């Protein structure tokens, strides 16, 4: 009888250990750390002078494109389409990375040539009109002409911010100048499911009403970043509409929290850098949907 009891206890212990091992294995597989996605980079720099004359205005376009190139576990084609679409636009999403980069560069040069040709045509009309005006009238009117067309500049690149736990967060930075004194820089943030390239949205990770709940946290973060004590002081630094600021869907996720980027012109003047607001998961647990990716990441802390 004692032998039977010992064997029974032994079997129960083995069963319990097997059950625990199975549970641990399941948890590890469904929420593994590494995505096992490899990335490659395409770099293209092209300069085009009007009429092939190096003394004339030109366009200069640079692309640095980081994209998923290989994986034994996920659908790389879906990931590539997502990266191409979000970096260059929906028009290019069915093209492979090399085709998309070359197509984007060639389209930029073509657009520049068309703009230059349109300017040349309008300049002829304006010159004919100006022939009827005095020099003073020309100088004071909107018909004053530049001797030559403008030069255009554009740089576009993307960077991987987070690549773990079934998520890829990446940021696209685009800078352009079309003849003005100031270059315009924008940041576009994307979070995608690493298994299929499907976007992760705010509605996927937050409970309803999250936007108003996050408002105060965003304002508090801006006050701390810029050393201001009041919203009025933020406005003195170049911010506006801060009391109405809300989450803008332009976010990144990592293993610590959510990062919002507010581009110049959204709530701040163009002379300021684009504000970035980091909100730790630990401060927004009640706002996170149960079993969402953000909720799971929060409990890794």
For the regions a language model picked out, list residue spans one by one.
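Sec-dependent signal peptide recognition
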Residues: 5-14
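C-terminal motif of bacterial Sec signal peptides marking the signal peptidase cleavage site
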Residues: 18-21
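Compositionally biased intrinsically disordered regions enriched in Thr/Gly
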Residues: 23-301
């Amino acid at each position: 009888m004692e032998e039977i009891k010992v064997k029974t206890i032994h079997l129960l212990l083995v069963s319990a250990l097997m059950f625990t091992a199975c549970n641990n294995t399941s948890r590890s597989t469904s929420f593994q750390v590494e995505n096992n996605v490899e990335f490659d980079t395409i770099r293209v720099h092209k300069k085009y002078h009007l009429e092939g004359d190096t003394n004339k205005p030109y366009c200069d376009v640079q692309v640095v494109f980081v994209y998923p190139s290989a994986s034994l576990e996920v659908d790389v084609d879906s990931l590539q389409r997502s990266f191409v679409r979000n970096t260059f636009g929906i028009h290019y999403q069915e093209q492979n990375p090399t085709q998309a980069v070359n197509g984007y560069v060639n389209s930029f040069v073509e657009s520049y040539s068309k703009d230059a040709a349109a300017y040349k045509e309008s300049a002829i009309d304006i010159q004919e009109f100006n022939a009827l005006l005095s020099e003073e009238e020309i100088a004071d009117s909107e018909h004053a002409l530049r001797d030559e067309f403008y030069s255009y500049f554009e740089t576009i690149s993307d960077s991987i911010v987070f690549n773990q736990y079934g998520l890829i967060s990446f940021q696209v930075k685009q800078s352009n100048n079309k003849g003005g004194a100031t270059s315009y820089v924008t940041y576009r943030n994307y979070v995608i499911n690493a298994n299929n390239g499907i976007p992760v949205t705010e509605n996927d990770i937050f409970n309803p009403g999250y936007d108003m709940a996050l408002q105060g946290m965003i304002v508090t973060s801006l006050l701390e970043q810029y050393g201001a004590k009041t919203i009025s002081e933020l406005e003195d630094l170049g911010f506006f509409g801060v009391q109405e600021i809300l989450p803008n869907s332009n976010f990144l996720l990592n293993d610590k929290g959510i990062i919002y980027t507010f581009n110049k012109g959204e709530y701040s003047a163009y002379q300021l850098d684009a504000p970035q607001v980091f909100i730790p998961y630990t401060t927004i647990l009640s706002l996170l949907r149960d079993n969402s990716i953000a909720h799971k990441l929060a409990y890794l802390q």
